[in-house]
Every structure is written in C-alpha cells, then in structure tokens.
C-alpha cells in the first residue's frame, strides 16, 4: 500500500493489525529511508544530491478530476490559466455558464464562490484575481453540511502559494467599448515581514449599460387589452470599493486576521428608460404614449468587516469567522407620459447583518470528522412612498438563523464516502408600519442531509450524491409595495412566499478526458414569476408582475464534457439537456408544455509559441417550451488574443464579445388571463483591451472564510 503525506506531514494507510510491516519513505532530493513500523514513527532523511547533465520531463495533467461532491478542474499548467481574470476564466470551467458576476452551474443554479477559503462578497473581486494565479478550481455540485441550506453549488478557487518578503503589487486596467464605454482600475499592495501581512486594495469602476426591448402584452378580461412597447434602457454608475487589513501567522499552527471593506457610489447612479407604447381595447387604439422613466440611486457608504482565526491544537483544526455588513440605498423614480409627470416614487432601504461561524475537525476512525455552528442575525427596513398610483409601504423584517452541522468523510481503498447533516432554526418577524404580522412571521426547523460516494481507479471514476436544499426568498420580494414599471406594467412582492425545498439526486462518471453526469430534482414550492391583470376595475389594461410558488415541480438533466488535447489545440465541448416538468394549474395558469432545452458550447484554446494565446468560443441554446415559459434559439461567439512579456509579469490582451451581434434573448410567457412576448438585447457586443502588471508576486495569507454568505446574498 502507499500514500502521499498531507501538508502537515501526517499520513494514513489501511493495514491489518498485529502484523509486521516495513515503511519506506521517499522524498525528492533525499535518500529513501526504510524502517520497521511502530505506532509513533519518526523518519530522518539524509540529502541525496546528484548532478545531472540534462533532464526533460513531459506530462499532461488531466483537466478534470472527479470527487464525491463534484469535480476539480486544474488551472495551473492548462489553458485556463491564460484567460485573463478569474471572472473571465469561470465561464470556461466545465458546466459553468455566465459572465459579468452572474454565473450558473448547469443543473444546480447560482454558485457561492470562494477564493482560498474566503467567500467572495463582491463579484468585482473576481476581476482582481488573475487566472494565472489560480492553482485549481473545484465545482461542487453537492455542497456538504457546512454550507448553508440554500447553497445550490460552490466554486472554490485555490491560488498558487507564493513565497517572498517585502512589498508586492498588482495593477490591472480594463477598457471595453460597446454602445458605450466601460472601464475599471484595480490596485493591490501587500507588505510582508516575517509572519505579518499588511494589505490594501482599491477598485474603481465606471459602468455604462444599454439595452433595447420589444414587448407585447395581452390581457383577457371583460375586454381584450393589448399593449405594444418599444423602449431603450440605459444605466450609468461609478463605484469605488476598497479593502484594508492584516494577517498574522505567529507560527505554522496559528493565524488570525481582520479586514475592512468599504464601498460607495461616486455621485448618483442613473437608470433611465424611454420609448413608446400603443394600447388597444378589442383591436381599437385607446392610448399612444411617449414615455420617459428616470431613476436616481443615491448610495452612501456600505461597510463590511471580517475577523478570523485558523489554528491547530494537537489533532484538532479550528476555523472561526465573524462578519458584519451594513448597506443602505435611496432611489427617486419619476415617470413622464406625453410630457406630463404622472408618477413619482421614493424608495429607501437600510439593512444590517451579524454572522459567526465555527468549524472544528479532527481525525476519527481512519477518516475525518468535522462539526460546527453558524448564526446570522439580519435586520432590513424598506420604506416606499408614491403619489397615488398604488399604496405606500413600510416593511420591516428581522430574522435570526441558528445552525449546527456535522460531517464525516472516509476513504476505503478506491472509494471515498461522505455523509453530513445540518440543523437550521429560522425565526422571522415581519412588521407593516410598526405592527407585527403573525401570519407573515414564520418559524422553521429543518434538517438538511447530505450523502455522497465516489469510486476512482486507473483513470476511471463514478460518483453518486444526494442533498436537500432549502431556499428563502430575497428580501426584495417580501414586500407589499407596488413598483411602477410603465403606465401599463406594475410589479409586486409577496410576503406570503413559503420556503422552497429541493431534493436533488445526481450521478457522474468519467474516463480519461470524457465526463458525464445526470441529475433529478424534486422541487417543492418552487418560486416563479407570473403575470396577471392588475385591478381591472380601476386600472384596466395594466399587467402585474408577481411571484408565486408552484407546489411540486420535477427537473431532469444530463451533461457531457469532452476536453482532449491535440497539439497546440485544446478544445472543450459541453453538451447539456435540461427538462423542467412544471404544472402551474394550482396557481391559475393552464398552459403546460414539455420540450427540453439543449445547450451546446465549443471552447477552443490555442497555446502558441512565444507567449501567445488565442481563444475562440461559441455557444448555442435551442428553443424550448417548458411549462408556461417558451424560449427561442440563441447564441454568441467571443474571442481573446493575449501576449505575455517580462517573464509573465506583464500581460496584454485584446477581447471581442458577441462578435456577430447575435446576443438576443426571446421568450414568451403565459400567465393568469395574460400573455407576453419579449425580444431583448443587452450591450453584449464589446471590444476591449486589458493590461495587467505585477511585481514581487506574493499572495496575502489571509484565511478568513466569512460567515452568513447566504444572508448577504439575500440582502
């Protein structure tokens, strides 16, 4: 039998008791040592230096490795390391789609992202990490018990551990031109002396977005109302975010640190929409409007802080995190129809969060046992006032979540087994205008089990897993306020939304550079957006966007990934089929269609001589009809060309997104006595330049993982 030691030098081999054994220890650069086994072995290795004239080592690291909870993609030494920033690299991971801070793991949903065990709170942080600093990326499709019950998937990025003392820095500039320009600047400095790290980071971004929408709404009531709308949306903002902190490692067994992260808008953010609507009643035109909607968002300072301790006490590992988060926003909305100011609204939000998490682990029965607790305390207050098109709202939510969890993992020959359980107690207090509403103040007690097993041998692997997931609605949905979208479109929250629960079963297998997975999910109280008429007696022809829950939904899917290497060319093919069996009869929608959706992407990487790298990728998503939702075929092609200089400390890249200008999104939606057609284009076609420079590259050793991430996302 044989094994490789862990980072602390400990190792584990399975053997029968009562028999004599010899242990052989080998380490590169030292002479091999052989000695009889005894319970507390100590090995003294002598240097073994040999002068070699020339050695050439050729090997290919597999891009994908399968584990019991998902898969691991090796980044260092592969084409993934040449994708620019971590944000640009993520969509090139197997079964990961999305961009601009919005990512999706096929068959799972939006992931929680970690960098070196530290949760990513601000997605712009992914722009600041270069892909060539990342050692590996784990895509966890069955999160363990230590993760919150609403975590659908996890992506963990592990950076390359670099040595060095003194001052180090990293600077990055990005510019892209589409319908309007976007730009950002990033600076990071780290000073290391002995076991102390002092670091400061700053990020400045100017964002301009542009979109065009063609829309048709039809409402059936006492009459048939149809509204056709064409509008253009723009959003302009400038933001600054920073990070200041320290990390201290007095020895190899203990470390602690603190970081403070402020963020604010520079001036006001502007969100505008303008266009025309034509409304008909029983095919006779009743209204023609030229409209303009302007919203100003006034942002003060948001504050976040994290403190952590990570240490070893004998065989026990301890990881503790405490978090604080404070956010507030204020927006004014004004709508003008045919030169008349018809709508004025004011929204104010203030929220705070306190969270703590403790994880303790130790070896047990030739495996690993971990347990811990997590607590989050959230306070959010929303005040909405308007000039008569709906009703004012004053919603105040206080929520406390207490969780305890335990997890055990064990390796038996070629098998890896993992089992865990998590208990969560959630108490919500909902107030309207200072009065507690008991019907909207539920208490939940949930047990979340996790089971996973995997087998691997000689390049082949197979895994099975099960997890229960529980989701609470975003706080923005738990409100009674009516939001104005246009004269004939309103939106509303729903404070009566129940908790959504998902039972997910998955299986996967791999061989060499082929990977296949399948999943089945049973979803209870699934959140869904619906459309319906809004108060036909007082607001005829107005469409209301709302959120409801569907009692039972089934979701099926299969995925295939192929990632061979053919000389300079490294292609990666992803094929995914998703089928949603959804019946919305119980919420009043009779439309039910069942047609799967296929997603196909081809990612082509060319590792060229002299530091050149070229990537071109394209995807196609087919039309589908699932439940009351109908989509059309869509796709895009994007490319990247980069060159490294000065021993890879300087990198310059040219990027092109949506080259053929095909990034349109078409969908039709059936509702309660209502129907909608949409054609949407966002400013996806962009051409850009990126310049990145680093010196004396060292990484901060900050090990804080953060707590209460699920509540941060909801806020």
Region locations from a protein language model:
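Short, acidic Ser/Thr/Gly-rich low-complexity loop/linker segments typical of extracellular
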Residues: 1-10
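Short, acidic, small-residue-rich periplasmic hinge/interaction motif at the N-terminus
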Residues: 24-30, 40-79, 99-100, 108, ...
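N-terminal periplasmic accessory domains that precede
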Residues: 40-46, 86-89, 123-124, 138-139, ...
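Surface-exposed extracellular loop regions of Gram-negative outer-membrane beta-barrel proteins
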Residues: 328, 381, 425-432, 455-504, ...
């Amino acid at each position: 039998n044989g094994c490789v030691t862990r980072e602390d030098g400990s190792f584990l081999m399975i053997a029968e008791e009562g028999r004599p054994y010899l242990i052989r220890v080998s380490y590169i650069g030292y002479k091999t040592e052989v000695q009889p086994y005894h319970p507390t072995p100590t090995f003294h290795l002598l240097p073994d230096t040999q002068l070699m004239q020339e050695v050439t080592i050729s090997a290919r690291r597999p891009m994908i490795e399968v584990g019991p909870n998902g898969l691991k993609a090796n980044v260092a030494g592969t084409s993934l390391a040449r994708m620019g920033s971590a944000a640009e690299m993520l969509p090139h991971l197997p079964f990961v789609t999305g961009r601009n801070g919005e990512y999706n793991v096929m068959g799972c949903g939006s992931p929680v992202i970690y960098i070196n065990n530290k949760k990513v709170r601000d997605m712009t942080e992914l722009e600041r990490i270069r892909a060539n600093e990342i050692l590996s990326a784990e895509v966890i499709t069955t999160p363990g018990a230590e993760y919150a019950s609403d975590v659908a998937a996890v992506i963990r990025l592990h950076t390359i551990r670099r040595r060095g003392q003194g001052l180090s820095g990293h600077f990055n500039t990005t510019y892209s031109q589409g319908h309007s320009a976007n730009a950002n600047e990033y600076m990071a400095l780290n000073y290391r002396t002995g076991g102390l790290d002092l670091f400061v980071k700053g990020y400045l971004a100017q964002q301009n977005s542009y979109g065009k929408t063609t829309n048709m709404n039809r409402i059936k009531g006492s009459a048939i109302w149809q509204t056709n709308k064409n509008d253009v949306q723009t959003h302009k903002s400038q933001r600054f975010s920073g990070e200041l902190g320290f990390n201290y490692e007095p020895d190899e067994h203990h470390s602690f640190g603190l970081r403070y992260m402020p963020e604010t808008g520079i001036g006001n953010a502007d969100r505008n929409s303008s266009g025309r609507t034509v409304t008909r009643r029983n095919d006779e035109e009743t209204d023609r409007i030229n409209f303009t909607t302007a919203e100003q968002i006034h942002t003060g300072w948001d504050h976040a802080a994290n403190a952590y301790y990570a240490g070893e006490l004998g065989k026990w590992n301890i990881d503790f995190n405490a978090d604080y988060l404070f956010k507030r926003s204020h927006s004014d909305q004004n709508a003008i129809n045919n030169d008349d100011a018809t709508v004025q609204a004011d929204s104010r939000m203030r929220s705070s969060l306190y969270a703590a998490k403790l994880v303790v682990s130790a070896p047990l029965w030739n495996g690993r046992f971990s347990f811990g607790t997590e607590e989050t305390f959230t306070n959010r207050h929303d005040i909405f006032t308007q000039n008569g098109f709906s009703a004012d709202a004053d919603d105040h939510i206080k929520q406390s979540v207490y969780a305890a969890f335990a997890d055990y993992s064990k390796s038996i020959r070629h098998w890896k087994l993992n089992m865990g359980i998590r208990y969560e107690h959630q108490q919500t207090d909902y107030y309207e205008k200072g009065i507690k509403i008991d019907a909207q103040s539920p208490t939940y007690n949930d047990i979340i089990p996790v089971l996973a097993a995997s087998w691997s041998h000689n390049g082949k692997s197979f895994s099975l897993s099960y997890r229960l997931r529980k989701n609470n609605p975003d706080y923005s949905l738990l409100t009674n306020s009516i939001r104005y979208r246009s004269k004939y479109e309103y939106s509303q929250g729903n404070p009566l939304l129940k908790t959504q629960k998902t039972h997910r079963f998955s299986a996967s297998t791999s061989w060499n550079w082929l990977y296949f997975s399948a999943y089945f999910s049973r979803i209870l109280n699934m959140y869904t957006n619906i459309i319906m008429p809004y108060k036909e007696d007082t607001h005829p022809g107005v469409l209301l966007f709302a959120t409801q829950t569907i009692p039972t939904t089934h979701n099926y899917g299969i995925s295939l990934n192929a990632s061979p290497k053919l000389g300079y060319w490294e292609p990666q093919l992803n094929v995914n089929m998703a089928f949603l069996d959804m019946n919305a009869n119980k919420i009043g929608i009779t439309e039910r269609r069942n047609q799967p959706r296929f997603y196909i992407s081809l990612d082509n990487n060319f590792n060229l001589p002299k530091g050149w790298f070229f990537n071109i990728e394209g995807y196609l998503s087919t039309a589908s009809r699932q439940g009351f939702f109908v989509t059309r075929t869509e796709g895009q092609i994007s490319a990247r060309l980069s060159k490294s200089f000065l021993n890879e400390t300087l990198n310059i890249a040219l990027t092109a997104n949506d080259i053929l200008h095909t990034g349109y999104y078409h969908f039709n939606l059936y509702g309660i006595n209502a129907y909608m057609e949409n054609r949407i284009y966002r400013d996806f076609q962009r051409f850009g330049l990126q310049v990145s420079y680093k010196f004396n590259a060292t990484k901060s050793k900050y090990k804080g993982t953060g707590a209460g991430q699920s509540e941060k996302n909801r806020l």
